[in-house]
UniProtKB/Swiss-Prot annotation:
Annotated organism of origin: Shigella sonnei (strain Ss046)
Catalytic residues as annotated in Swiss-Prot or TrEMBL: 376
Residues the entry annotates as binding Mg(2+): 333, 376
Comment on bound cofactor: Binds 1 heme group per subunit. Binds 1 Mg(2+) ion per subunit.
Protein name: Diguanylate cyclase DosC
PANTHER family to which the protein is assigned, alphabetical: DIGUANYLATE CYCLASE DGCM-RELATED (PTHR45138:SF9), REGULATORY COMPONENTS OF SENSORY TRANSDUCTION SYSTEM (PTHR45138)
Gene of this entry: dosC
Record-marked site positions (Involved in oxygen binding and important for the stability of the Fe(II)-O(2) complex): 43
Site (Important for oxygen binding and stability of the Fe(II)-O(2) complex): 60
């Protein structure tokens, strides 16, 4: 890639050097005068494509992209020789964002085609001479084409790397502590089954019972299991079993009086038992040949490390956008960790990180993700948790750690606490923005005295 970018730098520099300075000045004049119109028209046309619309539907994104597009047009069409290296880096950065969000390369290519199409009438409606218009158009189109080629090549490289990480994560997820995960999910679906059966047998209210897809097992399967075992036939079988039973469950819940009829009650109980039994059999088959593998895991805490953060965020953001379900993030700092580490030593610091990590696992659902983000900082991705549920989870974790007892080597008690920043997904497709606003909330928590939870709000 380095050699390629050097070659493109030489080509772009040559284009600028060989162009008549007057023509370059007129191209820059067109860009400055019409960038706002071109940006608005560009997004109006691009958003007609339903595939592109899903990436541009967020108001904040659209507002930011329009201003960014204006700057991009002015930068590319006003390029001087000294600007070329910086412009190539800009194309690379934009490509990385596109790959991170998951924008397909064909949409990027369509965007460049639209831009060249709407630029033509702008240039040819100017009061330049016919020869000048033609030269300005050729210089502008060649500049855009070079920028497009650099961006597309960088995008392909970034997207390929992301795809490899997606597959690496899938393999890691399959292998990571599989036996324990299998037993945990079997216990989860059995717990759901027992809860419903007891309520039916004791004539209790079923109103608080959840359909299988919304129970802990169903959430795990939809957010993790389907991805772990993608491409395996049993996944489709489990999906259909969950979907079919949810239909039966919802129909029963609409008229629970039918359960007073013994034959209907027995039929419903048998449907529950058969569904759970089949799912457990299929789960055992899926996990059968899986063994432990720790690549991608933080050795000290046994949490995920940040390697798979992009893969997971990209998938969960796509799921949240597709289903309309909530998504949230917690960024967590161990308060005064450096001071504790310096005072009591690294062994004590390591023990604190292990205890804190256990508190995370004990207070999240199996469909959630917990990462060691670096040092004493952690990220938790909460799937399908409302704002209230997000805050309750954060507060449970904070309270649990605050009550944790830890003694130093000399027997002295060490006080532990966490500062937590929370943020709700607001439709912005770039996960780094979600992390950024959660980090801003974390900063507020620290500024307000530590050992507290703060939720990011636009007014913060």
């Amino acid at each position: 890639m380095e050699m390629y970018f050097k070659r493109m730098k030489d080509e772009w520099t040559g284009l600028v050097e060989q162009a008549d300075p007057l023509i370059r000045a007129k191209a820059a004049e067109i860009a400055v005068a019409h960038a706002h119109y071109l940006s608005i028209e560009f997004y109006r046309i691009v958003r007609i494509d339903p595939h592109a619309e899903e990436f541009l539907s967020n108001e904040q994104v659209e507002r930011q992209l329009k201003s960014a597009m204006e700057r991009w047009i002015i930068n590319v069409l006003s390029a001087q020789v000294d600007d070329v290296e910086r412009l190539i880096q800009i194309q690379h950065t934009v490509a990385e964002v596109h790959a991170r969000i998951g924008i397909p390369v064909e949409i990027v290519e369509m965007g460049f085609r639209v831009l060249k199409k709407i630029l033509y009438p702008v240039i040819f409606s100017s009061d330049y001479s016919a020869a000048e218009k033609l030269q300005v158009y050729h210089f502008s189109i060649n500049s855009i084409d070079i920028a497009m080629e650099v961006m597309t090549r960088a995008f392909t490289f970034s997207d390929s790397s992301a795809s490899k990480e997606d597959e690496n994560y899938r393999i890691f997820s399959l292998l990571e502590n599989a036996e324990e995960e299998k037993e945990r999910q079997i216990a989860s679906i059995l717990s759901w089954e027992i809860d419903i059966i007891y309520k039916i047998l004791l004539d209790s209210d079923l109103g608080s019972s959840l359909p299988l897809s919304q129970a802990d097992f169903g959430l795990w399967f939809n957010h993790k299991g389907r991805h772990y075992f993608s491409g395996i036939a049993e996944v489709g079988h489990i999906s259909r079993l969950i979907q079919d039973f949810d239909g039966i469950f919802n129909q029963t819940m609409r008229n629970t009086r039918n359960l007073n009829n013994r034959s209907l009650r027995v039929k419903f109980l048998l449907q529950i038992r058969n569904t759970v039994s089949q799912i457990i059999t299929l789960l055992r088959e899926l996990f059968e040949e899986v063994s432990r593998h720790e690549v991608g895991m933080d050795v000290l805490t046994k949490l995920l490390n940040r390697r798979f953060l992009p893969t997971i965020f990209k998938r969960e953001i796509a799921h949240a956008n597709r289903t309309g379900t909530p998504l949230s993030v917690l960024i967590i700092d161990v308060d005064k960790f450096k001071e504790i580490n310096d005072t009591w030593g690294h062994n004590t610091g390591d023990e604190i990180l292990r205890k804190v990590s256990q508190a995370f696992y004990d207070n999240v659902h199996s469909s959630d993700y917990v990462f060691r983000y670096g040092g004493d900082e952690f990220i938790i991705v909460l799937t399908e948790a409302s704002e209230n549920e997000t805050l309750r989870t954060a507060e449970r974790i904070r309270s649990r750690v605050e009550k944790t007892k830890l003694k130093a080597a000399n027997g002295e008690d060490i006080a532990l606490s966490l500062s937590i920043g929370a943020a709700m997904f607001n439709g912005h497709p770039d996960y780094e923005r979600l992390i950024q606003i959660a980090d801003e909330a974390l900063y507020i928590a620290k500024r307000r005295g530590r050992n507290r939870v703060e939720l990011w709000k636009a007014s913060l």
